[in-house]
Amino acid sequence: MSLKSKFVEIRDNYVINQVKNLKLPEFKSDTIRRYEVIFSGRVQKVGFRLEVCELAKRLELTGFCKNLENGDVMAQLQGPDNKIKYLISFMESLKRIKIENKVMKELAVDSEMTEFVKR
């Protein structure tokens, strides 16, 4: 195993454990929405997609997260509006990630989205 792959493994385990042990607030019922969010900044090679994916699963959101060729990350997040806003706020609070800009666009809810995946 190379040093780089060992580092990635350590980082991924750290991210998974952080999300697993995160004390989530209690959420009231809220309107189901779907957003496409483009995150710019230091968002690739820092465990960003993994963190979004793991937290989205804990929040029972559906959608996906993927790297874009220009260095940004695009996420489609679907679920209760308050849970989506919590996920975005949480990601903005992380020190190892630096979101310099985010662009949110509301999309039509997609009833065929049944899970959250990292692409």
Feature locations, PLM:
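Intrinsically disordered, low-complexity, mixed-charge
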Residues: 1-119
